[in-house]
A protein has these predicted regions:
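N-terminal leader/linker segments that precede catalytic domains of diphosphate-processing enzymes
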Residues: 1-83, 88-137
């Protein structure tokens, strides 16, 4: 592992072990129109689907990278968006970490056995698509 990556991993492990800013940070980044439309991070619909995404960091040539994907163009609410690799929970997934790892393998070709899971960020409810998303780091 590179000299750059090891201190980064230690810091991320430390930070994930503490209190995360969660919904406060999410609201700080939310579009202003959310409140006017009655969208809420606090009210997750009972029929919300579960999803997982992977924030994957990797070193290459003394730099850190994080892969993002460009979603295809279609008629849905996430058409053409840039995001972390991820998607919906499959009944064959053991949990949402498995979902994130499976989707990352399908979307960017990273084998789950090559990933060191450090922890999770605060789940995010995506009102527009009715998904409760668990980010895995």
């Amino acid at each position: 592992m590179s000299d750059l990556f090891e201190p980064f991993l230690r810091q991320i492990r430390h930070d994930l072990g503490g209190t995360l800013p969660g919904k406060e940070a999410q609201m700080g980044m939310a579009p202003l129109f959310r409140a006017r439309n009655g969208e809420s991070y606090d009210t997750v619909r009972a029929d919300a689907r579960q999803g997982g995404v992977l924030a994957l960091f990797y070193p290459q040539r003394d730099r850190l990278y994080i892969p993002l994907i460009l979603r295809p163009t279609y008629t849905g609410v996430h058409s053409g968006q840039v995001g972390f690799p991820g998607g919906g929970f499959d009944p064959l997934d053991t949990d949402l970490t498995a979902t994130a790892l499976r989707e990352a393998y399908e979307e960017v070709g990273v084998h789950p056995d090559e990933v060191i899971v450090l922890g999770h960020l605060t789940p995010l409810y995506v009102y527009a698509s009715n998904y409760l998303v668990q980010p895995t780091v």
